[in-house]
Amino acid sequence: LLDLFASREIAATFFIPFGPDRSGRAVRRLFEQPGFLRRMWRLGAPGRYGLRTILSGTLIPSVPIGSARPDILRSVAAEGHEVGLHGYDHVRWQDRLGDLTPYEVALELEMASRAYQGIFGQLPRASAAPGWRTNERALLAQETLGLHYASDVRGRRPFWPVVLGRRLETLQIPVTMPTLDEIFAWEGPERRGPERALLGALVPGSANVLAVHAEIAGGSALPILREFISMARDRGYSISRLEDLARDVLGSGEQLPSCGIGLGR
């Protein structure tokens, strides 16, 4: 991904989990989420994710993700990209957030923030919830981090989140587009032209936000992402970091909506 972005002179935003890689424990979703196995089969998960990811935290011991390679993270920032939080224990947050106490939620965020500070020597300015999973406890705990913005949800446009009747001060910039792995798992002709499916999801004049997972877009799907970037630019779209979008939104004087956050599928 870094090579692609450098060749296209793109500055992007990277959200990194800083705790253990326990991806293999996501196997419980086979029993808890109807259709999960079918989606993984259509996605071709072993080939796209690799056995290291699929077995990590089960048959293969967990290793830290961001914290294990501070040199890589510093090189990402040195190339002009933004680096933000993507939780601490990604699988625990994504699968068990609703069971965590307010203290446990705050601790997950605090551990990620401390790891970030240990690498970059400064406080994080942005966060994206693992699996777009959030709730009232998480949003309230996140308020204490002093973030510039967060990207915790799927939606249509930037907004101020409302919790228990209170408008929070951390701007939300939602992901507006489908991800590549979602497109791969869809039925129908989109699978034969995923870059065109992405192109069709762009809304002219809007803040389009695309999330790409490094293990997919930086691997077997890299040619698809490369082609999508070319097609989008040919149609006049520019690509920037989310922190630049947040600064533009906050500096525009636009009256942003205040919205509650609900569970989607």
Q: What do these predicted ranges mean?
A:
Residues L1-A126, G131-L171, E190-L210, A217-R265:
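Catalytic alpha-helical scaffold of carbohydrate-active enzymes acting on polysaccharides/glycoconjugates
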Residues R157, Q172-P189:
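Positively charged, amphipathic and often flexible ligand-engagement surfaces
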Residues P178, E215-G218:
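Short Gly/Pro-enriched loop/turn and capping motifs at secondary-structure junctions
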